[in-house]
């Protein structure tokens, strides 16, 4: 049976109000009383209900994180850094995996609002502006324009695409292509595409749906390699770049002599397990730090700029 606040009060020999004051650290209390209450809480295994505290107008110290795909290696690493940063500041994270599903994203948003979380960091993009503007909690967006009043933190996606294209050009590529997702031009992938096109205006861009299975994705990439015979490819994420290297090897296409490949994200996973891949690195740790910093300023009712853009870098491997 779950222990209640009144059970703690009875065991400690104090009033429920005193127990509440100990939990919330309010008013003067003797060390003896605090020790008695804490000992009773430990004996009974009592845990304060943060959501109930939020309903009383007190901070629940909870932050909602809404992401489209937490199994994606970039998002999983970013979420890990966000949780670490939030914990440093006394906040716990509620992780919501929207799976690019508008209904699921809306349900999560409503759940976080109902539980009066202190703030929300979101990278999902399925809902309309009205859905996010209705939320009273401070919101910070990662890489997405959620609403006019919501600050956006991102890395320089346009420059990342341009950097990749310039590197392929430097290494003599005559028939480069880009393989990307099906996002619009204002999305992170879309901005990388614009950066790539600023160097290779005539280069073909091939769009693969994020909903494709690995087998179907592999088939699509294989057809592209066989039909286009590119000498350089920029891919909008590292995992697709790694898959492309695998397919190229199966087709006996040597990397980097016949085909140069550049990925995007530069996670620690890729750096440690696929160091062969040359990729554009996003400053994931800095992104997490800035997202939390801006959110805490919004929670504290401070004015913040609308856009924050962090520089990207090059993680050199041997695929170029």
From Swiss-Prot:
Superkingdom of source: Bacteria
Listed PROSITE patterns: HTH_LACI_1 (PS00356), HTH_LACI_2 (PS50932)
Signal sequence segment: none
Record key words, sorted: DNA-binding, Repressor, Transcription, Transcription regulation
Gene3D superfamilies: 3.40.50.2300, lambda repressor-like DNA-binding domains
Domain HTH lacI-type: 1-57
Disulfide bond entries: none
Protein name: Sucrose operon repressor
Organism classification: Bacteria, Bacillati, Bacillota, Bacilli, Lactobacillales
């Amino acid at each position: 049976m779950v222990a209640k606040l009144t059970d703690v009060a009875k065991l400690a020999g104090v009033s429920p109000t005193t127990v509440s004051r100990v939990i919330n650290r309010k008013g003067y209390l003797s060390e003896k009383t605090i020790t008695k209450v804490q000992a009773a809480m430990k004996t009974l295994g009592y845990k304060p209900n943060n959501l109930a505290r939020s309903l009383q107008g007190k901070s629940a110290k909870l932050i909602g994180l809404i992401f489209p795909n937490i199994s994606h290696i970039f998002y999983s690493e970013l979420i890990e850094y966000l949780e670490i940063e939030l914990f440093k500041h006394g906040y716990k994270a509620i992780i919501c995996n929207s799976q690019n599903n508008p209904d699921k994203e809306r349900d999560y948003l409503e759940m976080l609002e109902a539980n009066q979380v202190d703030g929300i960091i979101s990278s999902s993009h399925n809902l309309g502006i009205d859905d996010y503007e209705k939320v009273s909690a401070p919101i910070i967006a990662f890489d997405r324009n959620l609403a006019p009043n919501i600050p956006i933190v991102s890395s320089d996606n346009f420059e990342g695409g341009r950097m990749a294209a310039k590197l392929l050009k430097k290494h003599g590529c005559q028939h480069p292509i880009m393989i990307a997702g099906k996002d619009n031009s204002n999305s992170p992938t879309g901005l990388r595409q614009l950066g790539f096109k600023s160097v290779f205006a005539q280069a073909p861009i091939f769009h693969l749906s994020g909903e494709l299975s690995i087998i179907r994705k592999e088939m699509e990439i294989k057809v592209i390699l066989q039909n286009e015979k590119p000498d350089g490819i920029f891919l909008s994420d590292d995992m697709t770049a790694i898959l492309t290297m695998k397919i190229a090897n199966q087709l006996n296409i040597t990397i980097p002599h016949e085909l140069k490949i550049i990925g995007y994200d530069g996670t620690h996973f890729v750096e440690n397990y696929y160091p062969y891949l040359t990729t554009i690195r996003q400053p994931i740790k800095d992104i997490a730090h800035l997202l939390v910093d801006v959110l805490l300023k919004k929670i504290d009712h401070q004015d913040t700029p609308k856009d924050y853009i962090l520089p990207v870098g090059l993680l050199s491997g041997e695929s170029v």
